[in-house]
């Protein structure tokens, strides 16, 4: 197995983990979390933020780096356009995360669950809208990297 195959596997595996994590947060956690009363909702959200702000970058970094590396190593083979599109999707995911959800998450960590800011629901709604975009960017990146590996 050559370097390109190993890097391709790492990128697809990581993208699959990222897409799965985003899919579960968007379509598995979101509904039950939204039905909780204010205090348990905020406590659960804060717990998720504390956990995922470590886990998600640990998945993203090797995924993005290996996607770039396999693109360089394999060059202009049949999967080049697909891998480039996947890298753009991952970079868009990073942009939405850093400019959108991270500032909301940082603010949410300081909320008092018994007395959150008056606009906390609006901030959660904004986060949910951004998360929809993030989830589908991650899913798209996974599909593109997988297709690139198979081409």
Which residues fall in each region the model found?
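Internal alpha-helical transmembrane segments of multi-pass membrane proteins, especially GPCRs
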Residues: 50, 57, 84-87, 125-128, ...
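Mid-chain, well-packed structural core segment of small domains
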Residues: 79-104, 108
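Membrane-helix exit/interface motif
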Residues: 27-28, 60-77, 96, 100, ...
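Core segments of transmembrane alpha-helices
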Residues: 57-70, 134-142
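A generic hydrophobic-segment detector
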Residues: 109-151
């Amino acid at each position: 197995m050559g370097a390109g195959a190993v890097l391709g596997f790492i990128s697809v595996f990581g993208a699959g983990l990222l897409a799965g994590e985003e899919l579960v947060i968007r379509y598995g956690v979101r509904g039950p979390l939204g039905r909780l009363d204010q205090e348990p909702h905020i406590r659960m959200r804060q717990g998720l933020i504390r956990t995922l702000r470590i886990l998600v970058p640990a998945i993203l970094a090797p995924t993005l780096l290996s996607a770039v590396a396999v693109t360089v190593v394999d060059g202009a083979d049949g999967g080049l356009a697909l891998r480039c599109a996947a890298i753009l999707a991952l970079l868009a995911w990073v942009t939405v995360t850093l400019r959108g959800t991270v500032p909301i998450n940082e603010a949410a960590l300081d909320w008092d669950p018994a007395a959150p800011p008056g606009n906390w629901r609006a901030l959660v709604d904004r986060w949910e809208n951004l998360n929809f975009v993030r989830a589908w960017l991650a899913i798209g990146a996974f599909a593109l990297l997988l297709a690139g590996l198979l081409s």
